Amino acid sequence: MKTLLIIDANLGQARAYMAKTLLGAAARKAKLEIIDNPNDAEMAIVLGDSIPNDSALNGKNVWLGDISRAVAHPELFLSEAKGHAKPYTAPVAATAPVAASGPKRVVAVTACPTGVAHTFMAAEAIETEAKKRGWWVKVETRGSVGAGNAITPEEVAAADLVIVAADIEVDLAKFAGKPMYRTSTGLALKKTAQELDKAVAEATPYEPAGKAQTATTESKKESAGAYRHLLTGVSYMLPMVVAGGLCIALSFAFGIEAFKEPGTLAAALMQIGGGSAFALMVPVLAGYIAFSIADRPGLTPGLIGGMLAVSTGSGFIGGIIAGFLAGYIAKLISTQLKLPQSMEALKPILIIPLISSLVVGLAMIYLIGKPVAGILEGLTHWLQTMGTANAVLLGAILGGMMCTDMGGPVNKAAYAFGVGLLSTQTYGPMAAIMAAGMVPPLAMGLATMVARRKFDKAQQEGGKAALVLGLCFISEGAIPFAARDPMRVLPCCIVGGALTGAISMAIGAKLMAPHGGLFVLLIPGAITPVLGYLVAIIAGTLVAGLAYAFLKRPEVDAVAKAA
């Protein structure tokens, strides 16, 4: 029997995921097929307080059930649903709500700077809310491994609305002319229903860069500000840093100075990591900051400006300046320079690359390069020679920032700072940043085990998932707990993260790659010292986890079951 599963988004991401997983497994045993299209369903199971007023459910057998019972006894729950589901008739007055008057076919794109957690969590939230409204939906994830669940031209043509939940600039050319609403992954994840309502009301036709755009569309794009452009550059730079850092770590595994011997494997690994990947790091950062601002016309001057930042010694700070300068100059020329129609084709090929590259290049050589190089040299010297007290303070600040909003602007600002310092061979801050970023999900997992009676069944299962995400350095694993109880979760995590960051800096921990969590330990030399680093993570996790276990108020469901 084809069965539609509708889960109220207000029940929370963790509980919804748990129910979906358990009922899916039980459905296969009961020979039920869980589908997404309400038009093909023979039966609909609704988990929530009420059945949605949706004409798509008319005439179908519908069963309204409790999510706690579905999680605790999924097979029995499905058996009850099959036996007691009754034909449903939507109220006449409810045949024209937002879901009915709004779009029926929605395509969406999600993307975050690292392309790991927020990308997929936002996608799941959009899918859940859209299906709850009876909409057809498909979400394309622009993750770290490229586009997943790609939207086809036919699906774009049939779509009534495009939703883009992205913290970085993404290629949206295939959606030209379609009504589009843009938001962030954070809002799409935490305020899904409100964002979908706004999408229906505020979507405007999308015009790719280079074509005429309405003032509204242009102002919305600029409202994203410098932060989004910077994160776009960081997201493209990140794989380069990871690959280069791990190659350098493998080279060091043969001996700290083994790469100095020509013709050896250690020398080859150092050439790949330090001589190539790290050499391209700043140009890629600058190039894609400019790309985010001006689209393809900004890429060439951005890459050239980034390369000059390397050659002048101004490093990642110079690269950031070059990227923004190149992007805005290229955009200015593209939008303000008017040419006869016969010469318009020369703008993207000749005029924009030449003029913008000259302006950026001369500025980097004569105005920006040397002063910024002096600033970067001073910063690097201070970081490498600072005393223990300053190191502990810096580690505590960075650690606390990583736990403040778990994947939000403050978290990403600290992360971008650490990644940028890798270009100057300063590895201490990055070690503190990754260690602290692992604390929130690990602490929530620990709390659910220490104080099991204070958490309901779904939260206990969510704690197990958070432990795995924490080991992978995915701070967002703690978001379901923080969203439910922010006044207790966030202070506990910030204190634990600050402690971890402080210990990491105090022991002089170094991290060669900016991602991967504890699995980076599998690469010899990627983290040093290993034992001290583990102690730092464990200390912060214990403080945050035990503090939250003590402060946490018991859930009503958990108290009822204990009684």
From Swiss-Prot:
Keyword Transcription in record: no
Assigned keywords, A-Z: Cell inner membrane, Cell membrane, Kinase, Membrane, Phosphoprotein, Phosphotransferase system, Repeat, Sugar transport, Transferase, Transmembrane, Transmembrane helix, Transport
Q: What is its EC number?
A: 2.7.1.202
What compartments host this protein?
Cell inner membrane
Phosphocysteine-modified residues are C112
**Biological process annotations from GO:** fructose import across plasma membrane; phosphoenolpyruvate-dependent sugar phosphotransferase system
TM segment ranges: 236-256, 274-294, 304-324, 349-369, 382-402, 430-450, 463-483, 489-509, 518-538
Its EC top class is: transferase
Q: Which GO terms of the molecular function aspect are on file?
A: carbohydrate:proton symporter activity; kinase activity; protein-N(PI)-phosphohistidine-fructose phosphotransferase system transporter activity; protein-phosphocysteine-D-fructose-phosphotransferase system transporter activity; protein-phosphocysteine-sugar phosphotransferase activity
InterPro entries in UniProt: Bacterial_PTS_Sugar_Transport, PTS_EIIB-like_sf, PTS_EIIB_2, PTS_EIIB_2/3, PTS_EIIC, PTS_EIIC_2, PTS_IIB_fruc, PTS_IIC_fruc
The record's catalysed reaction(s) read: D-fructose(out) + N(pros)-phospho-L-histidyl-[protein] = D-fructose 1-phosphate(in) + L-histidyl-[protein]
Catalytic residues, chain numbering: C112
Gene Ontology CC annotation, any one: transmembrane transporter complex
Chief localization: membrane
> Where is each PTS EIIC type-2 domain found?
226-561
**Start and end of every PTS EIIB type-2 domain?**
1-85, 104-201
Classify the protein's membrane topology as the record does.
Multi-pass membrane protein
List, alphabetically, the Pfam families matched: PTS_EIIC, PTS_IIB
How is this protein induced?
Answer: By fructose.
Function per UniProt: The phosphoenolpyruvate-dependent sugar phosphotransferase system (sugar PTS), a major carbohydrate active transport system, catalyzes the phosphorylation of incoming sugar substrates concomitantly with their translocation across the cell membrane. The enzyme II FruAB PTS system is involved in fructose transport.
Free-text comment on this protein's domains from its UniProt entry = The PTS EIIB type-2 domain is phosphorylated by phospho-EIIA on a cysteinyl residue. Then, it transfers the phosphoryl group to the sugar substrate concomitantly with the sugar uptake processed by the PTS EIIC type-2 domain.
Protein's name in the database:
PTS system fructose-specific EIIB'BC component
